[in-house]
């Protein structure tokens, strides 16, 4: 009977372990181990038709230094297999350097925003409806990405090498996506990242090794990009003047004008040696030019009784105000919800973190180390990239730090595809989206410049649906509409609507001969709307796979229940069958008898009474607890033993939450030079504009 009981217990344990529903994908499919099935607010705030399929986790790149990149991927389960969106992968990067792309996921282009209850709510302008979007925390150490101390990256080519390693690992997890069209999008210092990554991809494609597949790079979208640092900084004073933020009556006007002239001389020196193959030291030192913005913000502080949060111009949206010396670091205000959301242990578990580090919007340690002192600014890469890849440079018109004026300045100096700058920069097309004028466009020779009205440094934060239409421009899904003999509009449509071909407001009596040439192959078909019923193969696969998994799990669970019942029955039968006579025979000698003392008889009676009060389960557990060979007199556990159990529990409660050392090195809470990151200042290194003279040694980051 004892052997039977042990067998039953072992079988019960093994079967129970097998019956624990695994995280979907812990089988042979590597993708499923990254599946995200729950988040705070997901099931109560997000409509079923809108819920994306999500994958997230830390992918190991280099085991020797524990480098892992965190990604969060969103895909639309309702997309049609014949839709252009079904074979599109969009990699989104935020800036810094050292600022997390979770800003993009939860404040800009992702399907969710975070509310004051720290739960997800819907973002109706999510880009995942136009293609799979993958948000990546990089370089190593940014956001939820991780690396060993002292293994920080320093230069742009190294960053690109690491990112291609991430792509290699990513396509090992999702091999079915390797033939997808690839788009890179991002903002701020991503204006340095994206061109370098694109250049590395094109070089890889040109020298494929055996077994490698080409990456189908289709387009780059750079928003308010930090592409040509000194040229961008040269635009600050003209921008302030143009928008009536400062005038010649300001007490610091002459000081500001002097710095602007010095910056102009630096830029002139850079331009004279732009085509040199050697790095220009003047181009690597942008402290003087960048310092102009710090002085402009200081010179325009409102001290005449203004509220504390209204004293300084917001450098990311000049129509807004902030406290001094923040000048924008407290914006967007939803960041105060995003930070605790991503620091929630439950959320970290939902996102499949292997290293439970504390999330920071921007890492000062990463930013300080990534100084790019051996890298050409990415503006030098644009001419060669434009030979092969279309590039969109879009700007929120209200941004100061990476404003559209600075972008146009470096574009007009750039030589690409046989000519310099835009031949006719005044030939602007009004951008009409969903029958509203949202900006203007200049297009020539694979380069598109877009200035977007009523938007900030973070265009998708302000205008999510308009920002999503940038992908329609990137994929040529737009119409050119004649307004009159000299003016035209660029027209995009709501999600899922295909372009109609060339439309004229006052068409002639006979159709234009070139109408057909502007119509896409899909324009003759009915508008391709996203079906709410969902007809994609991926959605069908998910729908069909889940019931199968559930059925298997239920069968295993049923088997476990039957085995448990059987085991309990055997244990109960064993308990009922134990010898009960007062005089017990000794198994070793049939003639000798073991006499029970009177106090023992009383104890047996008390136990019998107690056992009658216990239920079936309690009796069974008593059977488990009975010590073999000691009967009712099994030795009680000592106090020392109990203390050991408590000590063991205490030791087991380890904390692995924060792999970023909270030391002076992080300098969290310190304010420095204004930063060029996506949507905020580098909260660890660049928050003190009052000490700009000393802190200007640190690179102002986007």
Swiss-Prot record:
Transmembrane segments: 555-575
Low complexity bias locations: 511-538, 686-702
Enzyme class: hydrolase
SUPFAM superfamilies recorded: alpha/beta-Hydrolases
Keywords from the UniProt entry: Apoptosis, Carboxypeptidase, Glycoprotein, Golgi apparatus, Hydrolase, Membrane, Protease, Signal, Transmembrane, Transmembrane helix
Region: Disordered, residue numbers: 501-547, 663-702
Catalysed reactions listed for this entry: Preferential release of a C-terminal arginine or lysine residue
Catalytic machinery residues: 188, 399, 457
GO terms, molecular function: serine-type carboxypeptidase activity
EC number annotated for this UniProt entry: 3.4.16.6
Family of the protein in this entry: Belongs to the peptidase S10 family.
Record protein name field: Pheromone-processing carboxypeptidase KEX1
Organism per entry: Lodderomyces elongisporus (strain ATCC 11503 / CBS 2605 / JCM 1781 / NBRC 1676 / NRRL YB-4239)
